[in-house]
Regions:
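Conserved GNAT acetyl-CoA-binding A-motif
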Residues: 71-80, 211-223
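A conserved beta-strand-loop-helix scaffold within acyl/acetyltransferase catalytic domains
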Residues: 151-191
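Conserved acetyl-CoA-binding loop-helix of GNAT-fold acetyltransferases
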Residues: 62-67, 186, 196-210, 229, ...
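Acyl-donor-binding surface of acyltransferase catalytic domains
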Residues: 30-135, 245-246
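Short amphipathic alpha-helix that is part of the acyltransferase structural core
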Residues: 1-20, 107-152
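Conserved active-site alpha-helix within GNAT-family acetyltransferase domains
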Residues: 83-93, 223-241
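Peripheral terminal and inter-domain segments
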Residues: 251-341
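A short helix-loop-beta-strand connector motif used in the catalytic cores of GNAT acetyltransferases and
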Residues: 27-40, 50, 153-162, 184
Length: 341
């Protein structure tokens, strides 16, 4: 059986060698972090869980590798043995590569200030206050930067962040994804239409300077090489690659043998009523429904719909939920895409 461990000191030695700040947050009992074990008295294995990541330590344990706390998305093994066990227990997980960044960076304040000052005309940087927090929570691209705190009040008390503002709206956000006593873990997100303008570098540099002013360390972990390059521009150094097993809660609710009688009626073209009025095309291929569109970077996308109800579907590796009506496709419950054909 899997138990939540309150006395985190019992597993501190198991996590010796871990450099991820989320593990540090868990061992310090910060935010809504959890430590899970299968032996409360003498744990030889442990899972540290915070935000949407689970980190394993100690002896490989099948119960822990099979356990999925609510909200978990990424499982990070500490050894090949743990990785093999996760693959056995989570066969639908998608293995991805993440990039660790060295701790203890020696930042050049002058360089950071130059990046802040290079903010393009028409933009300004604002610290995230209550109003900006609310806006971030309402925008899918920025929600993850602030949502892992228990409340807005907790974020404003414990966290920190800055946003590049254009026409009164946030377009790039650097924020504390999580916190630990000695610092924060940085999350950076920029709207697709606002990328390659130096906005991410500017808001990240401003956040790092804020941390340095208050004696906090701004920890960084990268999901892709673009993030690594940005980190290096800011003064960090790349450390190493590591595996992460990406789960999707959607798979737990997918209907395995759906009634496809009405699926042909869902096919056709739909117009997205916001942004660039993008056209979505829904079609059947090999008995499954697919969504076809061209993203904002001009790249064709072909995504499979996964049935979760008679007329409801989800997309893997995202929170999007789609419902069909006779004359529309409804995205996430409120964006109505009118059927054109």
């Amino acid at each position: 059986m899997v138990y939540e461990l309150k006395d985190t000191s019992k597993v501190k030695d198991l996590f010796t060698g871990s450099v991820d700040s989320l593990v540090t947050s868990c061992l310090q009992g910060m935010m809504d972090s959890k430590i899970y074990v299968t032996d409360l008295e003498n744990p030889r294995s442990a899972m540290a869980f915070l935000a949407c990541f689970a980190f394993f330590a100690g002896e490989p344990d099948r119960e822990l590798a099979s356990f999925k706390p609510k909200g978990v998305v990424g499982m990070v093994p500490c050894s090949e043995a743990w990785a093999k066990l996760i693959e056995e227990c989570q066969p639908d997980a998608d293995k991805v590569t993440r990039y660790a960044i060295k701790k203890g960076a020696k930042f050049d304040r002058a360089n950071l200030q130059r990046l802040v000052d290079a903010l393009p005309e028409g933009y300004e940087i604002q610290r995230i206050d209550g109003a900006l927090y609310d806006k971030c929570m309402e925008i899918d691209d920025f929600e993850d930067a602030v949502c892992h705190f228990a409340s807005k009040e907790q974020y404003l008390e414990m966290g920190r962040g800055f946003a590049a503002i254009k026409d009164g709206e946030p377009v790039s956000v650097a924020s504390s994804y999580t916190v630990y006593r000695e610092g924060i873990e940085i999350e950076i997100d920029t709207l697709e239409s606002e990328r390659r303008k130096g906005l991410a570098a500017a808001v990240c540099a401003r956040l790092i300077l804020s941390c340095l002013d208050d004696g906090l360390y701004p920890s960084w972990d990268a999901a892709n090489m673009n993030s690594v390059h940005l980190a290096e521009k800011l003064g960090y150094e790349f450390s190493h690659e590591y595996p992460c097993y990406w789960l999707d809660a959607l798979l737990d609710i997918v209907i395995q043998d759906p009634d496809k009688t009405n699926w042909p009626s869902f096919c056709g073209e739909y117009e997205l009523p916001i942004k660039d009025h993008r056209i979505y095309e829904v079609s059947l291929k090999d008995g499954d429904l697919y969504l076809h569109f061209v993203n904002s970077e001009g790249k064709p996308m072909d995504l499979k719909f996964w049935p979760i109800g008679p007329d409801a579907f989800g997309l893997l590796w995202g929170d999007d939920r789609i419902t069909f009506t006779p004359d529309a496709l409804i995205l996430d419950g409120d964006v109505v895409c009118k059927k054109l054909s």
